[in-house]
Amino acid sequence: MLRAGAPTAGSFRTEEVHTGTTIMAVEFDGGVVVGSDSRVSAGTAVVNRVFDKLSPLHQRIFCALSGSAADAQAIADMAAYQLELHGLELEEPPLVLAAANVVKNISYKYREDLLAHLIVAGWDQREGGQVYGTMGGMLIRQPFTIGGSGSSYIYGYVDAAYKPGMTPEECRRFTTNAITLAMNRDGSSGGVIYLVTITAAGVDHRVILGDELPRFYDE
């Protein structure tokens, strides 16, 4: 790929497609909120402006994708397949912790081959809402977590703005504000915001369009 001058036809063909991104998940009493931006890039080209990076692993378990788009989706697909079999064997929905362990094991096994970071979040009858980070094959439960290239811009904001005991609507607002701030500063994040709220009652999907995003001082 040329480093100077105007890009030529086909100059992006050898660039790996990345969900250079901002992903986030937050626990609340009775469920979780998972959110992401929607931009996918290959080199300096934006190849998809509205890609949904929130992938279902089971009925009430989702993962948020970042890293190489193909690698992240491959991990999600493998995990979803294993969890489907696991649920059939148990004759009940798998636990969120089990889903996180599946993702962790796949990520660690193929750590030399796959470039991806997945956040696993969901609800089950045993522990309620849960959020797990799985970067590099680790597994840690957190009240909230962020990931992707845009996350480096918002650590200070999320640390200051998070408070225990938030309502679902407060969690959605917290997630929307954080991802919007990251999108304003990270060239690899952008587009719309996808939000998924998972509770015992089911899964609620929302899309925050560009003209509906909150506005901040720098704009």
Swiss-Prot record:
Entry protein name: Proteasome subunit beta type-9
N6-acetyllysine: residues carrying this PTM: K53, K109
One function term, GO molecular function aspect: threonine-type endopeptidase activity
Recorded catalytic activity of this chain's protein: Cleavage of peptide bonds with very broad specificity
PROSITE patterns, per database record: PROTEASOME_BETA_1, PROTEASOME_BETA_2
Organism: Mus spicilegus (Steppe mouse)
Note from the entry: Encoded in the MHC class II region.
Induction of its expression: Up-regulated by interferon gamma (at protein level).
Endpoints of the signal sequence: none
Chief location category: cytoplasm
PTM description: Autocleaved. The resulting N-terminal Thr residue of the mature subunit is responsible for the nucleophile proteolytic activity.
GO biological process: immune system process; proteolysis involved in protein catabolic process
EC number of the protein: 3.4.25.1
Protein family per UniProt: Belongs to the peptidase T1B family.
Oligomeric form and interacting partners: The 26S proteasome consists of a 20S proteasome core and two 19S regulatory subunits. The 20S proteasome core is composed of 28 subunits that are arranged in four stacked rings, resulting in a barrel-shaped structure. The two end rings are each formed by seven alpha subunits, and the two central rings are each formed by seven beta subunits. The catalytic chamber with the active sites is on the inside of the barrel. Component of the immunoproteasome, where it displaces the equivalent housekeeping subunit PSMB6.
InterPro entries: Ntn_hydrolases_N (IPR029055), Pept_T1A_subB (IPR000243), Proteasome_bsu_CS (IPR016050), Proteasome_sua/b (IPR001353), Proteasome_suB-type (IPR023333)
Any one Pfam family match given in the protein's UniProt record, by short name: Proteasome
Propeptide: 1-20
Annotated site residues (Cleavage) in this chain: G20, T21
Active site positions: T21
Role of this protein: The proteasome is a multicatalytic proteinase complex which is characterized by its ability to cleave peptides with Arg, Phe, Tyr, Leu, and Glu adjacent to the leaving group at neutral or slightly basic pH. The proteasome has an ATP-dependent proteolytic activity. This subunit is involved in antigen processing to generate class I binding peptides.
